[in-house]
């Protein structure tokens, strides 16, 4: 039987409570009656420390889940999605993401995946896409979200943005960092790819 780290158990409880009280999350995907625990091999990356020590991840309503994501980061399998792509060391050393539900996370589900994404101030996450439908729910800080065919949107805590399947989107921070809960539904297996692998015009 898989023993789940208490930090992950606390994070799951905070996630379930947030999902129950936020219509945008509950309307995007239902939570299954039970989640399957699975073992996690911790992987540490440089931006994990940035997230843990960032003094500007300000939030009021979402401080509990923000702190739970930070605490569980110590035992998480941080992701290296864009390793080997055109995104260089500066991006890889500052963009942070790990999974709560899904591949590499402490819990498995066939119906959804759940991640935390962190970007410090002054970082651009280029246009990318994936078959999964996605919602970003901002927990702390602020970021600008771009989606092809739509005007940019600057979002803060409690705001959300939906990304349709296969639709290119990007994220930029300016003078503040941000942290978001990210949920996927649909194709949970196919990783994101850069829309313009050779570089944006």
Swiss-Prot record:
InterPro entries: DMSP_lyase (IPR031723), RmlC-like_jellyroll (IPR014710), RmlC_Cupin_sf (IPR011051). Disruption phenotype: Decreased dimethylsulfoniopropionate (DMSP) catabolism. Keywords: Lyase, Metal-binding. The keyword Lyase applies. Transmembrane segments: none annotated. It comes from the Bacteria. It catalyses: S,S-dimethyl-beta-propiothetin = acrylate + dimethyl sulfide + H(+). Zn(2+) probably constitutes the cofactor in vivo. It is an enzyme of class 4 (lyase). The keyword Lyase applies. A divalent metal cation binds at residues 130, 134, 136, 169. Its EC number is 4.4.1.3. Pfam families: DMSP_lyase. Its cofactor is a divalent metal cation. GO terms for molecular function: dimethylpropiothetin dethiomethylase activity; metal ion binding. Homodimer. Belongs to the non-heme iron-dependent dioxygenase family. May act as a dimethylsulfoniopropionate (DMSP) in vitro, releasing dimethyl sulfide (DMS). DMS is the principal form by which sulfur is transported from oceans to the atmosphere. The real activity of the protein is however subject to debate and it is unclear whether it constitutes a real dimethylsulfoniopropionate lyase in vivo. This is Dimethylsulfoniopropionate lyase DddQ. It comes from Ruegeria pomeroyi (strain ATCC 700808 / DSM 15171 / DSS-3) (Silicibacter pomeroyi). The lineage of its organism: Bacteria, Pseudomonadati, Pseudomonadota, Alphaproteobacteria, Rhodobacterales. The gene is dddQ.
């Amino acid at each position: 039987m898989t023993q789940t780290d208490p930090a992950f158990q606390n994070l799951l409880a905070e996630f379930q409570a947030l999902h129950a009280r936020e219509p945008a999350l509950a309307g995007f995907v239902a939570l299954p009656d039970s989640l399957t625990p699975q073992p996690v091999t911790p992987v540490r990356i440089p931006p994990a420390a940035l997230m843990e020590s960032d003094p500007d991840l300000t939030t009021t309503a979402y401080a509990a889940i923000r702190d739970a994501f930070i605490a569980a980061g110590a035992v998480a399998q941080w992701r290296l999605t864009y390793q080997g792509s055109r995104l260089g060391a500066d991006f890889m050393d500052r963009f942070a993401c790990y999974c709560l539900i899904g591949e590499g996370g402490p819990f498995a589900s066939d119906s959804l995946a759940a991640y935390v994404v962190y970007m410090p101030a002054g970082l651009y996450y280029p246009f990318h896409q994936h078959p999964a439908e996605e919602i970003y729910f901002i927990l702390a800080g602020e970021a600008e979200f771009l989606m092809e065919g739509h005007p940019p949107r600057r979002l803060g805590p409690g705001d959300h943005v939906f990304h349709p399947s296969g639709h290119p989107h990007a994220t930029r921070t300016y003078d503040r960092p941000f942290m978001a809960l990210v949920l996927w539904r649909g194709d949970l297996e196919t990783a994101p790819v850069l829309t313009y692998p050779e570089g944006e015009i």
